[in-house]
Amino acid sequence: MDSLAAPQDRLVEQLLSPRTQAQRRLKDIDKQYVGFATLPNQVHRKSVKKGFDFTLMVAGESGLGKSTLVHSLFLTDLYKDRKLLSAEERISQTVEILKHTVDIEEKGVKLKLTIVDTPGFGDAVDNTECWKPITDYVDQQFEQYFRDESGLNRKNIQDNRVHCCLYFISPFGHGLRPVDVGFMKALHEKVNIVPLIAKADCLVPSEIRKLKERIREEIDKFGIHVYQFPECDSDEDEDFKQQDRELKESAPFAVIGSNTVVEAKGQRVRGRLYPWGIVEVENQAHCDFVKLRNMLIRTHMHDLKDVTCDVHYENYRAHCIQQMTSKLTQDSRMESPIPILPLPTPDAETEKLIRMKDEELRRMQEMLQRMKQQMQDQ
């Protein structure tokens, strides 16, 4: 029996040996493993738990399908209570700023989407500086964020800055109109502008190509800075690089929106039914809607937010700090012409409050001086 048991024990030992060796190798690897490679997962979990926010502005004259396109992009109706105005009412109304906010969740990821609409833009007989309320709104959001960022409670700052502006260009012209040029030049240093050719189903493919070329030429001619797609990293796969090339070649995007589901080749798709056929919203042979959606939501949403924060907001912030520094310098050089009267002796509590305020003012002045020095060094 012992002679039979010995081969069995050796066989079990041989079978267990690879597993034991693998466990030993894992233990050795575990000893060398620090753990910071899990940082991306930690950031991902924290970001998903917190959720994301994105503010999108839509601008352009009435009747170009702005509301329909927003509904098609996010599959959410933000204009349920909208009142349609007559032609006379549209002409007489002034430019308004309307915000629509909705919380969207997809596969556990939460997005707080804010759509900033601009009804009345470009509808008047005289459209001189009709973009002024819009530029004022963008500046107000920068100012509010700057105040919140400079305050004491910076933990839960609400970001209402405009991250992207979809500007709708009429397909019925021969390029950019003066109001288009004026709007984009007024906002191109404040927000990421993505120009769109609206209602692309009104044009044949050759007309769309000519209009795109004309708009690109005029954007360069007038020195308009639209949103620039970032360059691909060298380690990106070929499919992503090809997609990036197609995006850059397709700008400005010619888009179609539709909330209607139609039957096409045995499938139900969103599109428009005409006597001569069906235009499918998500058919890339018909329009650039899919490219716009991929760019705006799936590939470049975070970059739009980064450019807003690192470029447009930083320019505004630097301008504010320069103004504050200049004002402090002027105030320090001025001598008051009014004689200072002796004040009554303050009590202990008032004296303590004054000391705290003086200390706070001194810290702010030192901070501004350091910022000024850093800006001069740069």
Curated annotation (Swiss-Prot):
<keyword id="KW-0131">Cell cycle</keyword>
<keyword id="KW-0175">Coiled coil</keyword>
<dbReference type="InterPro" id="IPR027417">
    <property type="entry name" value="P-loop_NTPase"/>
</dbReference>
<feature type="binding site">
    <location>
        <position position="257"/>
    </location>
    <ligand>
        <name>GTP</name>
    </ligand>
</feature>
<dbReference type="GO" id="GO:0005886">
    <property type="term" value="C:plasma membrane"/>
</dbReference>
<feature type="region of interest" description="G1 motif">
    <location>
        <begin position="60"/>
        <end position="67"/>
    </location>
</feature>
<feature type="modified residue" description="Phosphoserine">
    <location>
        <position position="234"/>
    </location>
</feature>
<dbReference type="GO" id="GO:0035176">
    <property type="term" value="P:social behavior"/>
</dbReference>
<feature type="binding site">
    <location>
        <position position="94"/>
    </location>
    <ligand>
        <name>GTP</name>
    </ligand>
</feature>
<dbReference type="GO" id="GO:0005525">
    <property type="term" value="F:GTP binding"/>
</dbReference>
<keyword id="KW-0547">Nucleotide-binding</keyword>
<dbReference type="GO" id="GO:0030534">
    <property type="term" value="P:adult behavior"/>
</dbReference>
<feature type="coiled-coil region">
    <location>
        <begin position="347"/>
        <end position="378"/>
    </location>
</feature>
<keyword id="KW-0597">Phosphoprotein</keyword>
<comment type="similarity">
    <text>Belongs to the TRAFAC class TrmE-Era-EngA-EngB-Septin-like GTPase superfamily. Septin GTPase family.</text>
</comment>
<protein>
    <recommendedName>
        <fullName>Septin-5</fullName>
    </recommendedName>
</protein>
<dbReference type="Pfam" id="PF00735">
    <property type="entry name" value="Septin"/>
</dbReference>
<feature type="binding site">
    <location>
        <begin position="199"/>
        <end position="207"/>
    </location>
    <ligand>
        <name>GTP</name>
    </ligand>
</feature>
<feature type="modified residue" description="Omega-N-methylarginine">
    <location>
        <position position="177"/>
    </location>
</feature>
<comment type="subunit">
    <text>Septins polymerize into heterooligomeric protein complexes that form filaments, and can associate with cellular membranes, actin filaments and microtubules. GTPase activity is required for filament formation. Interacts with SEPTIN2 and SEPTIN5. In platelets, associated with a complex containing STX4. Interacts with PRKN; this interaction leads to SEPTIN5 ubiquitination and degradation. Interacts with DYRK1A. Interacts with STX1A; in the cerebellar cortex.</text>
</comment>
<dbReference type="InterPro" id="IPR030379">
    <property type="entry name" value="G_SEPTIN_dom"/>
</dbReference>
<feature type="region of interest" description="G4 motif">
    <location>
        <begin position="198"/>
        <end position="201"/>
    </location>
</feature>
<keyword id="KW-0132">Cell division</keyword>
<dbReference type="GO" id="GO:0031105">
    <property type="term" value="C:septin complex"/>
</dbReference>
<dbReference type="GO" id="GO:0017157">
    <property type="term" value="P:regulation of exocytosis"/>
</dbReference>
<feature type="region of interest" description="G3 motif">
    <location>
        <begin position="117"/>
        <end position="120"/>
    </location>
</feature>
<keyword id="KW-0206">Cytoskeleton</keyword>
<feature type="modified residue" description="Phosphothreonine">
    <location>
        <position position="345"/>
    </location>
</feature>
<feature type="binding site">
    <location>
        <position position="120"/>
    </location>
    <ligand>
        <name>GTP</name>
    </ligand>
</feature>
<feature type="domain" description="Septin-type G">
    <location>
        <begin position="50"/>
        <end position="323"/>
    </location>
</feature>
<keyword id="KW-0963">Cytoplasm</keyword>
<feature type="binding site">
    <location>
        <begin position="60"/>
        <end position="67"/>
    </location>
    <ligand>
        <name>GTP</name>
    </ligand>
</feature>
<keyword id="KW-0488">Methylation</keyword>
<keyword id="KW-0342">GTP-binding</keyword>
<dbReference type="GO" id="GO:0098793">
    <property type="term" value="C:presynapse"/>
</dbReference>
<dbReference type="GO" id="GO:0008021">
    <property type="term" value="C:synaptic vesicle"/>
</dbReference>
<feature type="modified residue" description="Phosphoserine">
    <location>
        <position position="336"/>
    </location>
</feature>
<comment type="function">
    <text>Filament-forming cytoskeletal GTPase. May play a role in cytokinesis (Potential). May play a role in platelet secretion.</text>
</comment>
<dbReference type="InterPro" id="IPR016491">
    <property type="entry name" value="Septin"/>
</dbReference>
<feature type="binding site">
    <location>
        <position position="272"/>
    </location>
    <ligand>
        <name>GTP</name>
    </ligand>
</feature>
<dbReference type="GO" id="GO:0051301">
    <property type="term" value="P:cell division"/>
</dbReference>
